[in-house]
């Protein structure tokens, strides 16, 4: 008997102790696992306490599998919520008489035990919403567990009633105005979570998925699906209240966003009726989860096909006023642009999203499929990859917002033509990106290879042809290590392209309109471009200077001037260097001046262009054998780089004893400018100062405003290079002030370069390029100029 005796251990203050422990945990915010929000303020709580004190919260929390859900109570004030929390945790609360009615009403809507009668019902239920940063919160969870919830609801009771009401609010979510102003990708993710997540999951195993790849149509479907939740939720609460006596369905969606209210009030009657019928059918067959899913899809499809035809009046902040389109067929037609426009007018999309919709729908790079909306009962499914297509669109939009100063002519040169890609796809600059140590000469050869396809698409940029731009940009400062003798490059070389070794007819006479600062007596070698025609390559043809004065020309040509290509200009440089090396090796004293220019050693047919003030070879001192070749003394000097192989329309014949340079000088001795007959054929607009011809008058005005007669305004911080364009300085620094050049590139360029021309002078020049390149490979070192 004694062994069977049992003792009863009683905790006298058990309940009060437990309640006090919960109160302490709440005050310390320990082990809290949910948050209640009202009027923008938050209160943390414990799920177990809320479930024990309210069957409404018990049902709500059973549907939530998030670790810490957030519930937003629309119709409850924060003071009332705080009082109800004190009541649930402590069992009592002190409140004034004027707040008693509101507190009891809120407590009855939340079914708090002791403050409400759960048997009679008829209260007002606020609409809790889950925050978007918890993966859709309650709404997505209710959609995902739809079949489980329906099976549980079949048992009936108070839990069934509140759960069914919660189900009736599933499609009524509308993102807040703040959330609708974020980027479109976030908008699409929220729309998937709040409006269409379980519909996609339930229908994937039963119905075929509609494929659509148009970005504009995808946004239209998202917008309209979210829009349809407004009238659908309103009719859902009405249908539920007419069939069952439920305590929580009178004002389900009392405080929605203003745009959703307007949409719900102005939607078509047919749309409302069809949505109401669909929801009624869903509540009559609550045990069948698939039927409910189909009904929700039905209201989505019908609201999309009819709701877009109605104009929304008011709330200009959410309606894109710039899109004044909204016909009866705007949403149902196969055109995705009209569908997206009607979705914009539905009042859900803000102006930022509307502009993205319009841009995406008009993008011709995406294929658009018709028949995106099927008949009643089918699924409205958005292809997930439509979201990733927007990344390219966003990048294009961002690229268009570049500052105009950053959009240099070099970038326009690479992106203008249809046959040319961007800088990454261009053959010229792809090589440059992969090997930054390339020689400038190799780059010029690659540029020349692309000039022909460029001429087929775009002939001029800012009034300049491709050859003119290449002549401006392609010749940087180069340093050649060679002999001790200073090498002065001829600064005013007239071209006489002869048909043969004894030809006397000049195909082109190119003279400069810029007067060189020399007197009439003699010409001295200066660092600036002011010297006389210097010693040239010796050949069998010696056409001596007619007057023997060697004065530089001062004429201005009114004819059409064609500029040198990079190969021709580089050939001149390499040829002069080779001759300089050969002369230094032979011990010949190189003297450049009037005496040698008039001695008959100069052959004008060897240099294929007039270089008036463009090139200067000067000795800068320092170690012996270091000679600096300043090709781009000024951009304006490069304007006078003129090709003598293409302008066949210029016909000026020179005598056997007079060079074209002196002939041009005699023509302009009286102070007038000689116009070469037949060069322009009456077309174009010549510059009265320098004689350059432009096809457009605006290009001529540009030239006169920024270039003609203007000194270079931009100075390279590392060398003496100056330019009239800021972009030229940038390109110069990028290419020239890098690591050393490689001689292999010079060899490749010398082997592949060939001058375009039909005379023997061009052939001789090409041969000299090969010889000069061979001499360079043997002992010449190219490196940047960092003076």
Curated annotation (Swiss-Prot):
Residue ranges annotated for the BTB domain, each copy included: 32-97
GO biological process: axon guidance; axon midline choice point recognition; axonogenesis; dendrite morphogenesis; gonad development; larval lymph gland hemopoiesis; larval somatic muscle development; nurse cell apoptotic process
Zn finger spans (C2H2-type): 685-707, 714-737
Source organism superkingdom: Eukaryota
Annotated signal sequence range: none
Record keyword Nucleus present: yes
Keyword vocabulary terms for this entry: Developmental protein, Differentiation, DNA-binding, Metal-binding, Neurogenesis, Nucleus, Repeat, Transcription, Transcription regulation, Zinc, Zinc-finger
One cellular-component annotation, GO: nucleoplasm
Subcellular location, record wording: Nucleus
Record region (Disordered): 115-200, 228-340, 506-560, 653-677
UniProt-listed CDD domains: BTB_POZ_BAB-like
Tissue: By stage 11, isoform B is expressed throughout the mesoderm, whereas isoform A, isoform D and isoform L are expressed throughout the ectoderm. Expression becomes restricted during later stages; starting from stage 14 to 16, isoform B is expressed in muscle. Isoform A, isoform D, and at low levels isoform B, are expressed in the CNS. Expression is also seen in specific types of cells in the embryo; isoform A and isoform L are expressed in a dynamic pattern in the ventral neurogenic region starting at stage 7. Isoform L is expressed around the tracheal pits at stage 11.
Biased composition (Low complexity): 162-175, 228-251, 263-293, 329-340, 537-560, 659-668
GO molecular function: DNA binding; DNA-binding transcription factor activity; zinc ion binding
PANTHER family per the UniProt record, alphabetical: BTB DOMAIN TRANSCRIPTION FACTOR, LONGITUDINALS LACKING PROTEIN, ISOFORMS F_I_K_T
Functional description taken from the UniProt entry: Putative transcription factor required for axon growth and guidance in the central and peripheral nervous systems. Repels CNS axons away from the midline by promoting the expression of the midline repellent sli and its receptor robo.
Subunit and partners: Isoform D interacts with JIL-1.
Annotated protein name in UniProt: Longitudinals lacking protein, isoforms A/B/D/L
Organism in which the protein naturally occurs: Drosophila melanogaster
The encoding gene: lola
């Amino acid at each position: 008997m004694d062994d069977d005796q049992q003792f009863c251990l009683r905790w006298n203050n058990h309940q009060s102790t437990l309640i006090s422990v919960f109160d302490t945990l709440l005050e310390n915010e320990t082990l809290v696992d949910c948050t209640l929000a009202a009027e923008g303020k938050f209160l943390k709580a414990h799920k177990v306490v809320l479930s024990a004190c309210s069957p409404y919260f018990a049902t709500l929390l059973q549907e939530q599998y998030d670790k810490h859900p957030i519930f937003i109570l629309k119709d409850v004030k924060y003071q009332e919520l705080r009082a109800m929390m004190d009541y649930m945790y402590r069992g009592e609360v002190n409140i004034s008489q004027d707040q008693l009615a509101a507190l009891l009403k809120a407590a009855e809507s939340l079914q708090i035990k002791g403050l409400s009668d759960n048997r009679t019902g008829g209260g007002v239920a606020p609409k809790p919403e889950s925050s978007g940063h918890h993966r859709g919160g309650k709404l997505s969870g209710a959609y995902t567990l739809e079949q489980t919830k329906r099976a549980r609801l079949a048992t009936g009771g108070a839990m069934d009633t509140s759960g069914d009401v919660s189900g009736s609010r599933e499609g009524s979510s509308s993102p807040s105005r703040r959330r609708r102003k974020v980027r479109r990708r976030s908008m699409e993710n929220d729309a998937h979570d709040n409006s269409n997540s379980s519909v996609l999951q339930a229908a994937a195993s039963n119905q075929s998925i509609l494929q659509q790849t148009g970005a504009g149509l995808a946004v239209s479907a998202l917008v309209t699906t979210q829009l349809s939740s407004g009238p659908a939720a309103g009719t859902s609460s009405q249908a539920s209240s007419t069939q069952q006596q439920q305590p929580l369905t009178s004002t389900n969606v009392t405080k929605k966003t203003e745009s959703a209210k307007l949409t719900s009030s102005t939607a078509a009657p047919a749309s409302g009726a069809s949505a109401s019928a669909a929801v009624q059918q869903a509540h009559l067959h609550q045990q069948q989860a698939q039927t409910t899913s189909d009904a929700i899809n039905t209201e989505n499809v019908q609201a999309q096909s009819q709701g877009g035809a109605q104009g929304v009046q008011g709330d200009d902040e959410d309606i894109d006023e710039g899109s004044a389109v909204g016909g009866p067929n705007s949403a149902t037609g196969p055109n995705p642009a009209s569908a997206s426009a009607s979705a914009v007018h539905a009042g859900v999309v803000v102006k930022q999203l509307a502009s993205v919709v319009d841009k995406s729908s008009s993008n011709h790079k995406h294929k658009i499929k018709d028949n995106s909306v099927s008949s009643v009962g089918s699924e409205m499914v958005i292809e997930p990859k439509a979201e990733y297509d927007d990344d390219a669109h966003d990048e294009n939009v961002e690229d268009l917002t570049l500052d105009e100063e950053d959009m240099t002519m070099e970038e326009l040169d690479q992106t203008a033509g249809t046959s040319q890609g961007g800088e990454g796809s261009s053959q010229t600059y792809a090589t440059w990106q992969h090997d930054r140590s390339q020689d400038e000469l190799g780059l010029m050869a690659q540029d020349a290879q692309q000039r022909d396809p460029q001429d087929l698409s775009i002939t001029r940029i800012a009034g300049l042809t491709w050859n003119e731009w290449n002549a401006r940009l392609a010749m940087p400062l180069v340093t050649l290590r060679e002999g001790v003798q200073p090498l002065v490059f001829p600064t005013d070389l007239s071209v006489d392209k002869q048909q043969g070794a004894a030809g006397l007819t000049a195909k082109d006479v190119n003279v400069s309109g810029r007067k060189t600062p020399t007197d009439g007596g003699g010409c001295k070698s200066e660092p600036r471009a002011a010297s006389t025609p210097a010693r040239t390559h010796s050949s069998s043809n010696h056409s001596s200077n007619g007057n023997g004065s060697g004065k530089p020309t001062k004429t201005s040509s009114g004819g059409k001037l064609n500029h040198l290509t990079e190969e021709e200009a580089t050939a001149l440089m390499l040829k002069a260097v080779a001759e300089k090396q050969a002369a230094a090796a032979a011990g010949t004293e190189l003297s450049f001046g009037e005496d040698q220019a008039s001695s008959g050693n100069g052959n004008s047919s060897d240099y294929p262009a007039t270089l008036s003030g463009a090139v200067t070879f000067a000795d800068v001192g320092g170690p012996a054998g270091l000679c600096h070749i300043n090709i781009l003394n000024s951009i304006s000097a490069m304007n006078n780089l003129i090709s003598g192989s293409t302008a066949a329309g210029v016909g000026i014949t020179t005598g056997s004893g007079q060079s074209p340079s002196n002939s041009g000088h005699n023509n302009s001795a009286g102070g007038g400018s000689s116009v070469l007959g037949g060069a322009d054929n009456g077309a174009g607009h010549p510059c009265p100062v320098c004689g350059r011809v432009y096809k457009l008058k605006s290009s001529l005005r540009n030239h006169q405003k920024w270039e003609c007669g203007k000194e270079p305004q931009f100075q390279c911080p590392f060398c003496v290079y100056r330019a009239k364009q800021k972009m030229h300085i940038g390109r110069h620094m990028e290419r020239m002030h890098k690591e050393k050049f490689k001689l292999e590139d010079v060899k490749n360029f010398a082997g592949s370069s060939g001058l375009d021309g039909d005379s023997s002078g061009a052939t001789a020049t090409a041969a000299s390029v090969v010889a000069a390149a061979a001499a360079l490979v043997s002992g010449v070192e190219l490196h940047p100029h960092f003076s």
